């Protein structure tokens, strides 16, 4: 909004020339999101408490979690507001990639909100059925995949980190691949959101990493020099990534151990979907497996646990997702959280290093 209102004035007032720079708008989208979280956060927490939107803790989980009973959830509403508003304020709203990503963020957010509302406000422990959630997740992701498939100039090739000449053409398989990336990322973040700050920390780190890749992918010279796919318009997504980083850090202010509020499905589903969409739009889908390694391991631990118990009658872990396994082994919750953050930072550095390893 500000880009369209103020940048045209640059011809008369040189000060407004800064609005053409992605770096400027990305930084201020981040700052705006962070300040918005600080200002609105306490009010959101109070409203959630007034709605009795309190987390129900599993009795079969670690005993240390029982003290979390009654902590407000659905705090992802704050995250969504702190992403969407700064993005609308600082981004170029003529950019179709911005709207595609916001579609997933808001769409998955609404889906998560309905599920959370049924569980914690209407006291329906089942919420939405897994089939219902999967149907809507896949439908929204399919919409993105179909749109991109028919978007003139958008490549349906798969690019691999470390290999500059290996990029197989997916053709029509690009659509189910997009669905796999977006839905998979959404559910992986959802599974990771089991400890205070465990999911939002890596999400912010992932968003910061993709901010860099969005900027490079949208710059013809930089992308050519670093030999990554050039995606015209992708650079504008750096503004949205900046808002995600700011919103993540702002929410972490309240979600750090011991948490004052949980994000709920409204936050985890939308954030994961956003990361998946960013990966697709920048042609860095495989990179998400690296920088989002914590999410991948969390999801795989559940898949392996369920598969092993179903076919072998034995569990691999004491409890899945894997962060609960470490809890039951006696590792303190804050230590697990910080270690997972450290791992994510290392993986982010590895992902960034692929820019020069091709």
UniProtKB/Swiss-Prot annotation:
Signal peptide: none annotated. Its EC number is 2.7.8.13. The keyword Membrane applies. It catalyses: UDP-N-acetyl-alpha-D-muramoyl-L-alanyl-gamma-D-glutamyl-meso-2,6-diaminopimeloyl-D-alanyl-D-alanine + di-trans,octa-cis-undecaprenyl phosphate = di-trans,octa-cis-undecaprenyl diphospho-N-acetyl-alpha-D-muramoyl-L-alanyl-D-glutamyl-meso-2,6-diaminopimeloyl-D-alanyl-D-alanine + UMP. The chain crosses the membrane at residues 24-44, 73-93, 95-115, 134-154, 169-189, 197-217, 233-253, 261-281, 286-306, 335-355. GO terms for cellular component: plasma membrane. It is found in: Cell inner membrane. GO terms for biological process: cell division; cell wall organization; peptidoglycan biosynthetic process; regulation of cell shape. The keyword Oxidoreductase does not apply. Its main location: membrane. HAMAP family: MraY. This is Phospho-N-acetylmuramoyl-pentapeptide-transferase. It comes from Citrifermentans bemidjiense (strain ATCC BAA-1014 / DSM 16622 / JCM 12645 / Bem). The gene is mraY.
